[in-house]
């Protein structure tokens, strides 16, 4: 299943607030469609599927990409759910978003794809690049890159920068100081249900 490119607000109405996908919040509190207002008890599988979809859409991943991250988190040992969230949060596109250099993860991915961002002084055009403590992320030193990022910064997606990141607005330079802690993950998610979803898939 490829990455979703359809109407974002429709997804937000179905799954709830997804800070990485869209700055918009739904006016209606129920899902879209003819039976959106009908409330029925969800099965355990439906709850697991919904949490998995929230994770996928928020971080802009294909099904195959998310499965790869789940397998990587399992191999790492410790809490699979927490490791999974940390892997996703430390992606370059998400790190740019959390630094406030882009209003959404799709906007951050565009910055990366078009070569507007440097990591440790080099252009990195891979959105899935896994940031590590000590990495320095900054705007490319050209007018087009700086202006685009400065425009993005006028409409930040989230108010606060997580404690594992630092950002200098004057130089448009951010630094990764560590790995994100669970309480700083902005998405409301039950990661255990995601792990359970993939466990039953084998």
Swiss-Prot record:
Gene3D superfamilies, sorted: Ribosomal Protein S4 Delta 41, Chain A, domain 1, RNA-binding S4 domain
Keyword entries, A-Z: Ribonucleoprotein, Ribosomal protein, RNA-binding, rRNA-binding
Residue ranges of every copy of the S4 RNA-binding domain listed in the record: 90-152
Function, in words: One of the primary rRNA binding proteins, it binds directly to 16S rRNA where it nucleates assembly of the body of the 30S subunit.
Pfam families: Ribosomal_S4 (PF00163), S4 (PF01479)
Subunit description: Part of the 30S ribosomal subunit. Contacts protein S5. The interaction surface between S4 and S5 is involved in control of translational fidelity.
Phylogenetic placement of the source organism: Bacteria, Bacillati, Cyanobacteriota, Cyanophyceae, Acaryochloridales
Gene that encodes it: rpsD
Name assigned to this protein: Small ribosomal subunit protein uS4
Source organism: Acaryochloris marina (strain MBIC 11017)
